[in-house]
Amino acid sequence: MLKLVQYIAPRVGGATPRPTACGWGNLLLISPRSGASSEKCITQRRHFLFSSASSSGTFASSSSLCTEQRQQFHGSRRNRETILFPSTYSSLQAQSQRAFRDSSKPDSDDYVDSIPKAEQRTRTRKSLFNDPDERTEEIKIEGVMAPHDRDFGHSGRGGRGGDRGGDDRRGGGGGGNRFGGGGGGGDYHGIRNGRVEKRRDDRGGGNRFGGGGGFGDRRGGGGGGSQDLPMRPVDFSNLAPFKKNFYQEHPNVANRSPYEVQRYREEQEITVRGQVPNPIQDFSEVHLPDYVMKEIRRQGYKAPTAIQAQGWPIAMSGSNFVGIAKTGSGKTLGYILPAIVHINNQQPLQRGDGPIALVLAPTRELAQQIQQVATEFGSSSYVRNTCVFGGAPKGGQMRDLQRGCEIVIATPGRLIDFLSAGSTNLKRCTYLVLDEADRMLDMGFEPQIRKIVSQIRPDRQTLMWSATWPKEVKQLAEDFLGNYIQINIGSLELSANHNIRQVVDVCDEFSKEEKLKTLLSDIYDTSESPGKIIIFVETKRRVDNLVRFIRSFGVRCGAIHGDKSQSERDFVLREFRSGKSNILVATDVAARGLDVDGIKYVINFDYPQNSEDYIHRIGRTGRSNTKGTSFAFFTKNNAKQAKALVDVLREANQEINPALENLARNSRYDGGGGRSRYGGGGGGGRFGGGGFKKGSLSNGRGFGGGGGGGGEGRHSRFD
């Protein structure tokens, strides 16, 4: 045993060997200090020494230990065993692994002896993670500030779902109320320039989209709070005029009778509100510049989609408007081409100017997809663009902003960082786009959006795009757009793309892997070119497990989830787009904004928490009027979603599995909590979780603490 420790010890502390102790059953193994002249001291590491299950554990040490070392552990240190030593054997392996990684931390004796004895007596055995499904434990010592302790200062955690009548700031206040507050964000402790810093950047409580504590900097569960970042005030008293009406109605469009216009709108399922120009029916009728038309012809577009046919005349006339359309309807071109025309009719950017057109998107994948379209159609007219999002280095993004770009595509959080730092400004912005506004509100970005819009001149042109039209999006449109035009493509009710064949398999949880294997075998056996396949699951761990399962059969497979770095995501998407890997396993980060040609199949290995996410997942196929197929494994654990799924299938004229109908009839659930705007839900996510049951008061997890229990979820669209 001693040889084992002697072998391990030099490899734990880096280049300089350090004495190391390790628990092995009921034994305490201690390595000598390699190269030291004396063995009169021993290093005691936090989370590293282990006792037996009883508080008075039995220790057997090497004969090489000196008297002082034995006294340290059997004498004066006996009172600390119950504090520093875990009392159970169940976490031995996890803690020993953590200890080897933490070998560079200060010696535990020095760490503890520096605490006044009065404070040592007040130590507690609270662990960082009390939830049974967590793998590691931390020991909290009052008076010692650790970067990851559960209680940080005076307002350590957001609360654990807490009392319904409690303080919103400490969780629980939102219980029973769909718009209730969540837990407050804990103080953030970090290390910078060798010093411990403490700040409170945001508070998860108070947001109307469920609960959610924050972990310091912008990591709130559920709705999360707004960032409390300083913004420079903007003076709008002396604004230079600008032009925003560039639309010239084509004679063919002007000469169409009201009957012809109405018939076309009915065929395309277009409904309008307000004074709306007639729709175009051909690219030649919109008077786009030659360089834009050349790119349209090069990419093989034959006719505008419904959202483009009706949206381009509105956007190019300078009007504010809201477009409600399902995924894959061509809305990106619906605002990018008018943006290019708008930019080319403005004064050139000067040094220090910000963008002329700003596009806000909820996710980095969608932002990158928008940038690709902007580059394809803007490069011929030298319209520069940049994409600003979190998860990537700031340096290159900052340089692009400082050099000047006519179009900036951004996620709200990263853009606020640059605005607060003075890296860019929005004084020249006259064309604003909010893409997937409903998704941004679901993700709790409303405070950030309002802060950004407050920096833009009020006479701007604003275009808002959404897949649904709930009252939260409607309120945002009324606040930002004023007198606006609204167009809807298809039904206002949430509905699936009718070009997608939907198959639902009601099965047991344990049989899903075998069913996936059979399904993939059938797809590959029945087609020489199976196309691309996306498999959606609920958790990051399951993504990794499923990728290993698929690769075990010799099939190339990529993975995307929130813990992947931006370079990893980019590599996986390049492989997927090029066809080198035609299977992608992902969480919901790929459910929106991922526009990849050739996706023929979408498989819902785990059914999502609500039908809105299901519709957006399967919307990755069947895009641009192509056909696609979706499969869903539906278990009894998803029974509360059965009624909503049956409604989605029935609206799309799909065949309904009798077992699913039986679940829908017998389900005792009615709506459920949910994590989106259609119900409350505790603070979701890894950094401040809560449950999704009705009025759940389930514990918050992770670093922020959970918000209060959500509402009863009676607002579900499919109740």
UniProtKB/Swiss-Prot annotation:
Binding residues for ATP: A325, K326, T327, G328, S329, G330, K331, T332
Catalysis performed (reactions): ATP + H2O = ADP + phosphate + H(+)
GO biological process: alternative mRNA splicing, via spliceosome; defense response to virus; immune system process; mRNA splicing, via spliceosome; regulation of alternative mRNA splicing, via spliceosome; regulation of defense response to virus; regulation of translation; regulatory ncRNA-mediated post-transcriptional gene silencing
Residue ranges constituting the Helicase C-terminal domain according to the UniProt record: 519-664
Top-level taxon of the source organism: Eukaryota
Localization (cell): Nucleus; Nucleus, Nucleolus; Cytoplasm, Cytosol
SUPFAM superfamilies associated with the record: P-loop containing nucleoside triphosphate hydrolases (SSF52540)
Phenotype on disruption: No phenotype under normal conditions. Upon infection with Rift Valley fever virus (RVFV) or La Crosse virus (LACV), knockdown flies exhibit increased mortality. No phenotype upon infection with other viruses, including vesicular stomatitis virus (VSV), Sindbis virus (SINV), nor Drosophila C virus (DCV).
CDD domains: DEADc_DDX5_DDX17, SF2_C_DEAD
Main location as per UniProt: nucleus
Motif Q motif mapped to chain: 281-309
Gene Ontology molecular function terms on file: ATP binding; ATP hydrolysis activity; mRNA binding; RNA helicase activity
UniProt feature, compositional bias: Gly residues: 172-188, 206-226, 701-711
EC id: 3.6.4.13
Domain Helicase ATP-binding: 312-487
Keyword Nucleus tagged: yes
Biased amino acid composition, Basic and acidic residues: 99-108, 137-171, 194-205
Disordered: annotated span: 94-234, 689-719
Motif interval(s): DEAD box: 435-438
Signal sequence extent: none
Family in the record: Belongs to the DEAD box helicase family. DDX5/DBP2 subfamily.
Quaternary structure annotation from Swiss-Prot or TrEMBL: Interacts with Fmr1 to form the RNA-induced silencing complex (RISC), a ribonucleoprotein (RNP) complex involved in translation regulation, other components of the complex are RpL5, RpL11, AGO2 and Dcr-1.
Function according to Swiss-Prot or TrEMBL: As an RNA helicase, unwinds RNA and alters RNA structures through ATP binding and hydrolysis. Involved in multiple cellular processes, including pre-mRNA splicing, alternative splicing, rRNA processing and miRNA processing, as well as transcription regulation. Plays a role in innate immunity. Specifically restricts bunyavirus infection, including Rift Valley fever virus (RVFV) or La Crosse virus (LACV), but not vesicular stomatitis virus (VSV), in an interferon- and DROSHA-independent manner.
Protein name (record): ATP-dependent RNA helicase p62
